[in-house]
Amino acid sequence: MMQLLQLLLGLLGPGGYLFLLGDCQEVTTLTVKYQVSEEVPSGTVIGKLSQELGREERRRQAGAAFQVLQLPQALPIQVDSEEGLLSTGRRLDREQLCRQWDPCLVSFDVLATGDLALIHVEIQVLDINDHQPRFPKGEQELEISESASLRTRIPLDRALDPDTGPNTLHTYTLSPSEHFALDVIVGPDETKHAELIVVKELDREIHSFFDLVLTAYDNGNPPKSGTSLVKVNVLDSNDNSPAFAESSLALEIQEDAAPGTLLIKLTATDPDQGPNGEVEFFLSKHMPPEVLDTFSIDAKTGQVILRRPLDYEKNPAYEVDVQARDLGPNPIPAHCKVLIKVLDVNDNIPSIHVTWASQPSLVSEALPKDSFIALVMADDLDSGHNGLVHCWLSQELGHFRLKRTNGNTYMLLTNATLDREQWPKYTLTLLAQDQGLQPLSAKKQLSIQISDINDNAPVFEKSRYEVSTRENNLPSLHLITIKAHDADLGINGKVSYRIQDSPVAHLVAIDSNTGEVTAQRSLNYEEMAGFEFQVIAEDSGQPMLASSVSVWVSLLDANDNAPEVVQPVLSDGKASLSVLVNASTGHLLVPIETPNGLGPAGTDTPPLATHSSRPFLLTTIVARDADSGANGEPLYSIRSGNEAHLFILNPHTGQLFVNVTNASSLIGSEWELEIVVEDQGSPPLQTRALLRVMFVTSVDHLRDSARKPGALSMSMLTVICLAVLLGIFGLILALFMSICRTEKKDNRAYNCREAESTYRQQPKRPQKHIQKADIHLVPVLRGQAGEPCEVGQSHKDVDKEAMMEAGWDPCLQAPFHLTPTLYRTLRNQGNQGAPAESREVLQDTVNLLFNHPRQRNASRENLNLPEPQPATGQPRSRPLKVAGSPTGRLAGDQGSEEAPQRPPASSATLRRQRHLNGKVSPEKESGPRQILRSLVRLSVAAFAERNPVEELTVDSPPVQQISQLLSLLHQGQFQPKPNHRGNKYLAKPGGSRSAIPDTDGPSARAGGQTDPEQEEGPLDPEEDLSVKQLLEEELSSLLDPSTGLALDRLSAPDPAWMARLSLPLTTNYRDNVISPDAAATEEPRTFQTFGKAEAPELSPTGTRLASTFVSEMSSLLEMLLEQRSSMPVEAASEALRRLSVCGRTLSLDLATSAASGMKVQGDPGGKTGTEGKSRGSSSSSRCL
């Protein structure tokens, strides 16, 4: 912007240069804008005008000055005359400068005499949050009847905030109240006021008044607020209150309305009779005093009357709050808002102010057109069109004009070059008129004196010069002479010439004194047909005046370019053309052009089209000529080679025809034609070309094309590419199918090492090696009829036989978990209020169920199988722990030593033996069967205790719940199923292929290998029994001693039941693998020892799985018994007595058979023994 301003200050254009010789100057207008916050300290710098104009150093040297043409008196701004420094002279208050306008803009003009610029300065005064919202009164008093309906609205005083923008009034809040709420209403003029709303019925007897705090907030940073106390007095109820026809009204009034003018008549009705129905009107006392002084209302008629004249410039709008109330006691006033908008009236005459750029009325004739003379400001206090002023000049010659800059400000400019010799003085009339309906105008006389100066610039004889010359001229050729005249005298009239810089300025030159223009070099029409340049004429005056003119030079073409053949393509001035002839018919076919002059080109066979018409078009010769007009129009002719007149050449189009119908006789012949292309210039230029035409048959052409190597056609390339792509796709598809088939085949068998390799390739899991020790063999857990406890063991040692002879039965070593709560419940029920006979029977039953000589039992966290220990003598009894601890240790003599434990010699898997009779003798009943019967007894006892009045049935919910856990005891096989993330052992149906090798005693193969034919043997169909059938047989066998318990008929394992086990899990997945009858070993197990190392001896009794199921049953019974711990024990004693009799009948009374190994001593109430104490057969045994 500054550079453009400087350029404009240096040049005027076609009229000449700007200059400053007198008091008046030509000025370029410039608008600058500044911002300043209000309340800044005095002397704050706002801006610097010299920086806006640039070239400060030059201005200092030239003594530049800044002159304020107009400065509003209300704006305390100081302008430095040397550098144009703008600063505040005193305190700035935006509310005083622009009370009702936002943004607040204050403008004035400054003339920079040394820079030839008129600067229009606009200063925006920014508002700061220096005022807080204020209410007209700090306390408002309202009256409302207690019978006021809900949603009744009461207007409140409006807060005033003189700030603008975000600093002005933003919202209202009301102190918490359950009877009143606040609603903020935004008016048409964006004003905000609050209304009090009744949200809960009022009761004067409860609350006769309310004190509420109304707070008004602005949106400044930080926000400011103002408060007002609102006192609401609750009056006795009045049946009805007046009602306005409309709650809010808006009207307009001219500002020139006379006092006493009726503005509006309000009406309100009250349905009451008498004084309660008479309505009177009054203005709200909460309105500003200015409103109360300007308007009044008749109390009886409701007429709103103007009291004093209005002035739109002071207040353009008023808001009047009118209330109406009846004359009854405790009236409820009704409210109506009346918005009065004042319409501006053209009642102000424009005023004219003239500020001269220099000393008054003296203007130099040196000023060019559009030079600044003075600043004219027209002002009108009206608004809108009434305040828009239009100014114009009344003059005879029209040498001056007015130009609007902004608003009502004009510049007086020169409209022509002034000439003192002709008009030494001008008298102008300045008129100003507003744009109102009834416009008002003003006028002012201006007298201007003209001073003499060098005011004439050189003037050319023509406004534009044109000249023509032929190309290929000689250097220094005279083109034209330019003439300019200057009306000034002396050196001011001496003119010099020069050519303005341009891209073509180097082609010509001009004599600075005579104006003769010459060519500097030879010109070429083909490069440019013409060019234009500017010639500037300057006088010698001070300042120098100049003018310019445009000169156009057009070139005439000369025939200096010969035609050039572009088709067919020539090689060394030669081209060949092969014409195909059908040997049988003699018809001509489509010819083939050869640009190399050696014969047919290309290997593609062209599409053949027979032409039997006469003459036949062979080709079209095309030539180009760079010249224009007749110099560029070629003519074609055959100079030689066409003596037989076989060929015809069109001289204008260049089409070559063969004049023959049957071309059979021409096969094998060659013709050389000399073609001449000549333009029509003077003198003409020509080009020669040799065209060889050969007539060949189509068969010979195809044979020749096949012999010669060439590029494949596009169609052939496409076919080859498609074939290659299809072949590649077929190979990829075959390879993919082969890989998929191989993977499918490999997935049919499990390979430990492949699983380990696959597991190692898992990217998201830490690699874990699968070793032989991670795969455990799970034997079949089933008690078979007629099968002793030593089935599946290949070796018997002498120590075990000695223990059997001493009365130790390994079948009884199965660990049985009894929770403390269940033990205490059974014992306490036998001692609380039961007769001696019942206690004796209960004690016998307890002995029968729990007092078995047992190995130290493993907890749920450590499920290790017990090892048998030989009985070295008669064990001595050892007292049990007290009643609070159900578990105790049975120990022998102090000198007895614990028998050493050693693992069995074989690791053969147990295999269930089938029996034909399907019966089990009570004398040879195995350990799991006795455990099962003990569980049934506990189940029946718990059921009888919980439901003593109900009858025992198979379909009872508790029995069904217990039967589900009992069925788990019969669940059979488990097999390892390796997973890439660890081994997950799932139950496998009995009819499926077993992953555990079966062995038949000593015939088991070494390393756990078995015969494949034995792996897929089906089980007995009798095994497919439901849980309900199994439970019915067990209960019937228990209550009927003559019937045995068919334990060999097992149900198929169900993985759903396996999922119900709440086995304790550890972080090491290897500890969670169930391996019944497998003794703990410290020997390392790897893949190298897989199937070779000897496994510990397996035992069909006392398995860890059975112990876990018994623990589950114990927990179930504990929950059942705890729910009815206060139940009388008569029913339980009777049930236990029956169970004891059935047990003795079935030879299950283990208390007698184990008398040699353990004795229970009870001395309730001071008898022979102490309750809860017992003696075991080994120091490592545990009594549950």
Curated annotation (Swiss-Prot):
Residues 28-135, 136-244, 245-352, 355-460, 461-565, 600-711 form the Cadherin domain. Residues 740-1184 are cytoplasmic. Residues 854-928, 973-1023, 1153-1184 are annotated as: Disordered. GO terms for biological process: calcium-dependent cell-cell adhesion via plasma membrane cell adhesion molecules; cell adhesion; glycogen metabolic process; homophilic cell adhesion via plasma membrane adhesion molecules; labyrinthine layer development; neuron recognition. Residues 25-718 are extracellular. Expressed in highly vascularized tissues including the heart and placenta, but most tissues contain a low level of expression. Prominent expression in the spleen. Present in villous and extravillous trophoblast (at protein level). InterPro entries: Cadherin-like_dom, Cadherin-like_sf, Cadherin_CS, Cadherin_N, Protocadherin/Cadherin-CA. This is Protocadherin-12. It comes from Homo sapiens.
